[in-house]
Design a protein with these regions (language model features):
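Short, charged surface segments at domain edges that flank catalytic/cofactor-binding sites
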Residues: 1-37, 61-66
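Catalytic cores of phosphodiester-bond-cleaving enzymes
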Residues: 2-9, 15-17, 24, 101, ...
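Histidine-centered nuclease catalytic patch
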Residues: 40-89, 93-94
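Long, low-complexity, intrinsically disordered segments enriched in glycines and aromatic residues
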Residues: 82-141
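C-terminal, charged low-complexity interaction regions
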Residues: 124-193
Length: 193
């Protein structure tokens, strides 16, 4: 970006020195690419509820700190003390070169969901999926409750199979702003489509 090109012998751009308007532009771009969902759990997020996640943590490889393809938006902007965390804030600096990157074309194929909102590896021998679920706390009670709540309209309305398919097709399509609402598109694709 233009901001990085300002580097000189007296100043080197760093992620910590990234400020608005460049940081806001970066967030908007990532959020558009992710269609308004967390890169890990797929819940709906906004500029006010996200943080920028480094897929390869800065502590592992500082040279990738400003690489666009190494950044994604993860849920939970602020982390109050004693909070049970999930996704990027739970992951912290954990990194395994064999982990499932949210940028992988087929990343969602590694996971399956249950109607109670829980997530599991699609194949119980898939250690990559097991590690992601564990290290990111993707079965955190808060996430399970949110996924279950996303399914509640189907359950509450006692939809027929055809109605469920129509509903799932609707919520797995991006809205006019290019965002998923209510989020969790993989949940609906796995259970219904």
């Amino acid at each position: 970006s233009e901001w990085k090109s300002l580097a000189n012998s007296d100043w080197t751009p760093t992620f910590d020195s990234l400020r608005n308007p460049q940081k806001a532009e970066l967030i908007q771009s990532l959020l558009r690419e992710q269609h308004g969902i967390c890169c890990y759990c797929e819940q709906s997020i906004s500029e006010k509820t996200l943080h920028i996640e480094h897929l390869v943590p800065q502590s592992v490889d500082a040279t990738k700190a400003l690489e666009y393809r190494n950044m994604a938006c993860s849920c939970i902007r602020n982390t109050p003390q004693n909070t049970n965390l999930h996704c990027g804030h739970k992951r912290e600096n954990w990194y395994d070169s064999d982990y499932i990157s949210p940028l992988e074309e087929d990343c969602e194929s590694h996971f399956s969901f249950s109607w109670d909102g829980t997530i599991r590896p699609n194949d119980c021998t898939d250690n990559r999926a097991v590690n992601m679920i564990q290290h990111l706390a993707l079965n955190h009670v808060v996430l399970n409750e949110k996924r279950k709540a996303a399914l509640d309209p189907i359950i509450d309305l006692q939809m027929t199979k055809e109605q469920m398919i129509l509903y799932a097709q609707k919520v797995t399509q991006q809205n006019s702003n290019g965002m998923y609402n209510p989020g969790f598109p993989s949940l609906f694709r796995d259970l219904i489509l």
